[in-house]
Amino acid sequence: MLFLLFGGAVAGLFSGARLAQFSGLLLMLHGLASISAGLFACDPGCNPVEPSRDQMLHNLSGLVMFASLTLANLLRVYLARERLGSAGFSWFSLACLIVSLAVMPMMAAAVESGEAFGLYQRINYGVAAIWLGRLAWILTRMQRAPLAVL
C-alpha cells in the first residue's frame, strides 16, 4: 500500500514531466505487484516441477516487481540530474542499478541449483529498497527547500 501512495506522490510531484510521472506510475505498479505476490503464495519449496496456479502468479508478480522497480531506477539515473539537479543521486541510482542487475545471474543459477535463491533475492530487493529510501529522502528535502539541499 505504501508503494502505491509513494508512487502516486511521485507522479503528482512532477506534473507535466512525463518521464518523472511514469517513474511514479512504475512505483505504483510495483505496489500492486507486491500485493499480488502476497496474495498468491509459493508452493512448498517454491520451485516444484509442476507449479500451481498460485505459484505461477506469485512468480509473475515477482517479475513485475523487479521489472517495475528496476525501470524506475533506470529512469532516475537520467531524471536525478534533469529534474532533481542531483548528479550524486544519479550516480547512486546507477550504482544501485548495476548491483541489482549483477545479482540476477546469481539468482538464475540459484534457481537451477535450488540453493540460495532467497539470499540473492534479498540482496537484490535490499539494494532497491535502499535506493527507494534515498529517493524518498531527497524528495522530502526538495519539498522543504527546492534544489537547495541537492
Q: Where are these predicted regions, by residue range?
A:
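Hydrophobic, aromatic-enriched alpha-helical segments typical of multi-pass transmembrane helices
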Residues: M1-Q143
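Short, Lys/Arg-enriched, Gly/Pro-containing loop segments at transmembrane-helix junctions
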Residues: Q143-L150
